[in-house]
Amino acid sequence: MIANGNGAGHRAGLDEPPGHASTSFRIDPDRAALVLVARSNAGPITFGATGIEGSISVHVAGGEVATHVPPAARLEVPVQRLTCGNGLYDAELLRRVDARLFPRAVVELQGASPIGATGRYHVEGVLTFHGVTRSMAGTVAVSFPEPGRMVIEGEQVLDMRHFEITPPAVAMLRIYPEVRVQLHLEADTAHP
């Protein structure tokens, strides 16, 4: 708690009076990555993609996201960039997710609330992948390592069947439907 001018306490950044402007951040595609860790009958297979684009609008106070002003974000993941380095596996994954027909996965933030004073937030939004839109919820860590830079990290387990995707199979290899998704984003203050 921090004492304000009238001697009353408030939580820095969380109970600021409404009306403060949000700060817009632009995701740096060179510093943003998505990692999918799929389990298979032959062990884990890791697919990754860079080049994530999008924007984030948040009110920052005291080095934290102040959620009294609802944050907003939209991320676009280029599905065709998903790769594990094995051409056969890559081709099968891109075929199963119909990457030519659905070249981007889109995440739209709809709400966030702090989890104590930990720098972690419960987030809710929608994910559109393979032409299917689903509500999602999870936890992300947010930090501001330097002025004008935001770092977001999160992890979530998704079932590909919820997006009408048949789990990939190549020869004797079978990939299980639940996939661990890890996200790392770095964003800089957007300048008009």
Predicted regions and their residues:
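Low-complexity, acidic/polar, glycine-enriched regions of mature
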Residues: 1-192
